[in-house]
Amino acid sequence: MKKTIKSSKILGPLFQLTAGSAIAQLITIMVSPLTTRLFTSEDLGIYTLILTIISIFGPVLNGKFDMSIVKSKDHDELVDYLNLSLIIGFLFSIFVSVGYTVYLFNNKVIMEKVGLIIFVILPIILMASALINTLTSLNNFEKNYYLISKVYVVRNISQNIMMISVGLIHLGVIGLILSQLASLFFGIKSQAVSLKKELIFM
């Protein structure tokens, strides 16, 4: 009986997270043939290259203090890790943005496609990613797996809808990047509800 209860506690959250990821991936697969028609291979290539920065640095933007949030033993420790995660995430986002900006500025092909606005968008994307890392870890600490899964699906759906929209009006690479940026903000309010409470009562 105890083993059954323990298994259900493990499998339940695992199913919720896996289901959310599976739904998001399915949506991306379904939309993919359309996006390849709306954007040139060059647009998609440059977009992927720019977003590589998120794939590489995204998981470590918070100095792994976001992972410590999940293992917090008490409220004071939780608040300390939340603050550290947010501050380090903000600072490291700026640091990475400056370094990557130098690379982009010296790449004429990319600059012709995206323009100077990328120097504004890139730091915002990284800061939003750092914030999401912190919020997701807080939701994980609270065992709010349904919210994590739901937000992941909502972001994926919104991004794909916006990608199609900007593709139809031929915004190219900058449209793809803007759709990525905008989608990050979907669900942040829901995820941040408990963050406000924790920081208010610190």
Question: What are the roles of these predicted feature ranges?
Answer:
Residues M1-I27, D74, N83, G115, ...:
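N-terminal membrane topogenesis motif
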Residues M1-K2, K9-P13, S32-T36, E112-G115, ...:
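Generic detector of short, locally flexible boundary/turn motifs and exposed helical patches
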Residues K2-K9, F39-S41, S55-I87, T134-L147:
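Transmembrane-helix boundary and interhelical linker motifs in polytopic inner-membrane proteins
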Residues S8-G63, I88, S97, T101, ...:
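Signature of the first transmembrane helix
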Residues P13, L17, L44-G45, Y81, ...:
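Alpha-helical transmembrane segments and their helix-entry boundary regions
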Residues F15, E42, G63, M67-S68, ...:
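Flexible, active-site-adjacent loop/turn segments at secondary-structure boundaries
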Residues L49, L61, L78-Y81, F95, ...:
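Alpha-helical structural motif
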Residues G58, I88-M202:
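Hydrophobic transmembrane helix module of multi-pass membrane transport proteins
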